[in-house]
Each structure stands twice: as C-alpha cells, then as structure tokens.
Amino acid sequence: MLQMIPARPSRALASLSEAYEECRQITARYAKTFYLGTLLMPEAKRQAIWAIYVWCRRTDELVDGPQAAQTNFATLDAWERRLERLFAGEPEDDCDVALVDTLARYPLDIQPFRDMIEGQRMDLLQNRYSTFEDLYTYCYRVAGTVGLMSQPVMGIESTNSRAPWDPTTPPDPTQEALALGIANQLTNILRDVGEDARRGRIYLPQEELAQFNYSEQDLFNGVIDDRWRAFMQFQLDRARDYFEQAERGIRQLSHDARWPVWASLMLYREILDVIEQNNYDVFRKRAYVPTWRKLCSLPVAMLRATVL
C-alpha cells in the first residue's frame, strides 16, 4: 500500500538517488510487465518514467486503493494543490523528490496530470458509462494522459521529417502516444471485468451491451455464451485498433525509446490474446502473460525497433 497524502515532512527528505530507488522498487512491485520494459531504457529516462509512474499510481490509489473509502472531492482538490507545488519545485515526500527532479529535466506539461486527477473525480461520480464516447473520456483521463506525460521523456526523433514531395501524412506523435494509453486502459478494463463487477463497477459501454442483448444481471452472474463472446470480440478488436494506431507513432520516437515502447505495447497486447485463449472468461480467470512469453517478446520488439 502506498502512502497517499502525508503531512508536510518533519524529517529530511531522501537524496535524489534514494528517491529514484524508491520509485524503482514501487514500479517493480506493482507493475512487473511495465517495469520490464523500462529496464530497456537509458538510465535517466527510466528513472523519469518510474517517477511519473509512481505519481500516477498514487493518484489512482486515492479512489482505487485500500483507503479509497476515505477519499472525497476535498481529498482530490488537496492532491491537485500538491501537484501545483511539485511543479513549483516543492517536494513533500521522498517520491516527490524524484518527480520534482524529473520535472526539472524534461518539459512536462501540468495539464495531463490535472486531467488524470479529473479522471479520479469521475470515479467518485459514476460507476457506469452509457456510450463508448463517455468511456473514451474516462480512458483518456486515467490512462491516455500517461502517454502524454511520458512523451517528453521518450523524445521525438528529429530525423523523421519527410521529404517535401512525400504526399503521405506523418503520424502525429501526440495522438499515437494517446492511442497507446487508450489501448492499455481498454485492455485493463477487459481483463478486469469480473473484479470490477464484484465492486459494483461496469466499465463497459451500456449501449453496446444492449446491442448484444447482454444485461447487467448477465454480467454480474458471469454468463459466458455466444452473446458475451461476440460482445467481447468486438471490444478486443477495438483495443487492437488502438494498439495498431500506437504502432505507427513508435518510429517517431527517439531511437533509445523505441525498443522499450515496442516491448511494452507487445506485452500488453498479448493480454488480449490470453483473454481469447481463456474463452473470454474474465469472470473466473485472470488473463496474464507468462514470464517465458514476455522474455520471448523482447528480441522481437528489438527487431521491430531497429527495422521499422
């Protein structure tokens, strides 16, 4: 469990190396697949990504962690004020020290951070989403923002400019970074359907459930039939479309960021394959990618990062 909003420190804060080490340990503990991808980055970039991840996780745990019952709008308002102090260079605990250093090293914009907090406010307000457009807004705020936060750290390859006579439109790195975050969150949602349902939450578009004639009660009962399989296949296909869009932007990244981003994308997308292999049973089976498959993906990711 991570500490959320402690009082201002009465002791000396950690050194910079200690702060980044704490962020590394938290990332390794809570995000094993993601952490594996960060190890492929240069040291400075992976440390910055760890610091960003820890802030995002702490933000998420405000409404989704062990102390979530104590969180209200005032809690999130206080967290946003603390964010403003971080951007002003005022850390309040050890993990903050790492993020403040990251903010000094890279041109991060505060708006994606604010938007993520707004996503947590959405979680306090609602536990259903009528349309995919509504769900997309939520996905942007809680996950698409991560891509926007990370992009300045990853860097854009300046040599990717095209010849003036090339009629094709180059990918927009910002949109591709956003697409990867959306794809990851849609994957999380599909993997965690059963877990969320047990908490009374449904992150699946109500309109689309109705189109497949699948009711909330069916979902709470964990019914797996042709309706559910067709519905889930539709959702999986859409998530894969976002991963495909994200692929087009990877070649725009700096060379030293392409391998880890390819690895992260491939490893996360494999969760969708596992859901299919589990016959779409996300109620009783946890879709996870075995370690051996993760390791097998790394050389493929390296090849794609080099060739594409």
Curated annotation (Swiss-Prot):
Q: What is this protein called?
A: 15-cis-phytoene synthase
> What family does this belong to?
Belongs to the phytoene/squalene synthase family.
Catalytic reaction equation(s): 2 (2E,6E,10E)-geranylgeranyl diphosphate = 15-cis-phytoene + 2 diphosphate
Q: Which UniProt keywords apply?
A: Carotenoid biosynthesis, Magnesium, Manganese, Metal-binding, Transferase
What this chain does, per the entry, is described as: Involved in the biosynthesis of carotenoids. Catalyzes the condensation of two molecules of geranylgeranyl diphosphate (GGPP) to give prephytoene diphosphate (PPPP) and the subsequent rearrangement of the cyclopropylcarbinyl intermediate to yield 15-cis-phytoene.
CC cofactor note: ATP is required for the transferase activity but it does not seem to be hydrolyzed during the reaction.
| Pathway(s) served | Carotenoid biosynthesis; phytoene biosynthesis
Which co-factor is required?
Answer: ATP; Mn(2+); Mg(2+)
> Gene symbol?
crtB
What Enzyme Commission number(s) appear in the record?
2.5.1.32
- What CDD domains does the database record attribute to this sequence? Trans_IPPS_HH (cd00683)
Task: Tell me which domain of life the UniProt entry assigns to the organism this sequence originates from.
Answer: Bacteria
Q: Which GO terms describe its molecular function?
A: 15-cis-phytoene synthase activity; geranylgeranyl diphosphate synthase activity; metal ion binding; squalene synthase [NAD(P)H] activity
What phylogenetic lineage does the species belong to?
Answer: Bacteria, Bacillati, Cyanobacteriota, Cyanophyceae, Synechococcales
Q: Which Gene3D superfamilies match?
A: Farnesyl Diphosphate Synthase
**Alphabetized InterPro entries for the sequence:** Isoprenoid_synthase_dom_sf, PhytoSynCyanob, Squ/phyt_synthse, Squalene/phytoene_synthase_CS, Trans_IPPS_bact-type, Trans_IPPS_HH
